[in-house]
A protein has these predicted regions:
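Conserved N-terminal alpha-helix of the aminotransferase class I/II PLP-enzyme fold
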Residues: 66-99
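A glycine-/small-polar-enriched, mobile loop at the entrance of the PLP active site in fold-type I
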Residues: 38-43, 57-75
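N-terminal glycine-/charge-rich "phosphate-binding" loop or analogous flexible N-terminal tail
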Residues: 3-19
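Short clusters of hydrophobic/aromatic residues that line enzyme substrate/ligand-binding pockets
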Residues: 13, 65-67, 229
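Short secondary-structure boundary segments
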Residues: 63-72, 78, 161, 292, ...
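PLP-dependent class I/II
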Residues: 2-4, 8, 31-37, 42-58, ...
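An N-terminal-biased, well-structured beta-alpha scaffold segment characteristic
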Residues: 17-34
Length: 404
């Protein structure tokens, strides 16, 4: 592992406007005011690590961007990262490359189910899960997470799995595929080994394939530990597709490269067949370079980033408790996305979404996007300089203070 002594300044504000940035440059195109402050989509307002930048500079200066494929150094970096950070010893042949996790979800849906089949998800959940299922003519079956509002203390999230309903739905709907979000976006749960074991045993009994979206696996707060679902029991690895990417961890979403781990050869071949049908073959040339550099030498940057995100989380918690007590923080165990319970404002989900934009001047992700149970919530991205977060909270406070 390469050690970097660079101290990163995450307080520095980088102007992202005018860079074709989805987060900042497309407000009007998406029906928002031009001056809205965005804390929605899950990328970060921080420049990448020095090692990634240097590696990309070298690749760009070479001047030729032809068809590319990863070599041993790439695979070794990916596998070493998983073993070092997630206690998972993987094999090169398990890895299937895709341009993104959502792309991989679509391939899995087509590989392992047929039109009309039911696929189970756990709302409120990352909204592309629902879209991918419906867009491929499958049916969404929802095992809604149970939410019990807590006192707002660190370490008390309030969300849990309804295991009885989970198994009942698998039986009644003849579920073939379950899409797990681990860590969970947007509610911030980092599922325990015991919870994952129970899910796995149920899926094993009912012969259900699990696609585990673990893209947020490197963001877990102190006191919690991410467990790769496929490592809980060797039997589970045989029916699991594990989706990972450097995009969330190292802010590389625009370079479009993901690593999908499929130990079972039969499942892997079926998945690869669906990838082949799309015509996708060679990954983004610069994505290969950035991913290798990130996993090989990005740990120091990531450690500093995690510390900064924790400071932002603590600041947000204290701000809400002291100045906007009507809005409740659902304590995240992981991810840099926080889930705000706005039910005490006494307005409908649709009214809440309009209030956030029109009165607070903010662009957040409205909770209804994540399923009906999310209507009273808003998702906020705290991976930004503290000054940006403070400005957003000040705008939110002013709007709540004036709410009639």
């Amino acid at each position: 592992m390469v050690s970097c002594m660079t101290t990163y300044n995450f307080d520095k504000i980088t102007n992202r406007k005018g860079t074709n940035c989805l987060k900042y440059d497309f407000a009007v195109e998406r029906g928002k005011p031009a001056d809205v402050l965005p804390l929605w989509v899950a990328d970060m307002d921080f420049p990448v690590s020095e090692e990634i930048t240097k590696s990309l500079h070298a690749a760009v200066e070479h001047g030729i961007y032809g068809y590319s494929q990863p070599k041993d150094a790439y695979y070794n970096a990916v596998m070493n990262w998983m073993e070092r950070n997630h206690n998972w010893k993987t094999e090169r042949e398990w890895i299937v490359k895709t341009p993104g996790v959502v792309f991989a979800l679509g391939a899995a849906v087509k590989a392992f189910t047929d039109p009309g089949d039911a696929i189970l998800i756990q709302n409120p959940v990352y909204y592309p899960f629902t879209n991918i299922i419906r867009d491929n003519d499958r049916r969404v079956v929802d095992n809604t997470l149970i939410y019990e509002k807590t006192a707002g203390q660190s370490g008390d999230n309030g969300y849990r799995i309804d295991f009885e309903d989970f198994e009942r739905k698998l039986e009644q709907e003849h579920i073939k595929l379950f899409i797990l979000c681990n860590p969970h976006n947007p509610v911030g749960r980092v599922w325990t080994v015991e919870e994952l074991q129970q899910l796995g045993e149920i899926c094993l009994r009912h012969h259900v394939i699990v696609v585990s979206d673990e893209i947020h696996n490197d963001f877990v707060y102190s006191g919690y530990e991410h467990t790769v679902f496929a490592t809980v029991d060797p039997r589970f690895a045989e029916f699991t597709v594990t989706c990972t990417a450097p995009s969330k961890t190292f802010n590389l979403a625009g370079l479009q490269i993901s690593n999908i781990f499929i130990p079972n050869e039969k499942l892997r071949k079926a998945f690869q067949t669906e990838i082949d049908k799309t015509g996708y073959d060679e990954p983004n040339a610069l994505g290969i370079v950035a991913c290798e550099a990130a996993y090989r030498a990005g740990e120091d940057w990531l450690d500093q980033l995690r510390a900064y995100l924790l400071q932002n989380l603590n600041f947000l918690r204290e701000y809400l408790q002291e100045k906007i007590p009507q809005i409740h923080l659902v304590e995240p165990e992981g991810t840099y996305l926080v889930w705000l319970d706005c039910s005490q404002l006494g307005i409908t989900g649709k009214e809440l979404d309009q209030f956030i934009v029109d009165k607070a001047g903010l662009w957040l992700d409205g909770g209804s996007m994540f399923g009906p149970s999310g209507a009273a919530f808003q998702r906020v991205n705290i991976a930004c300089p503290k000054a940006t977060l403070e400005l957003a909270l000040n705008k939110l406070k002013a709007a709540v203070d004036n709410l009639e």
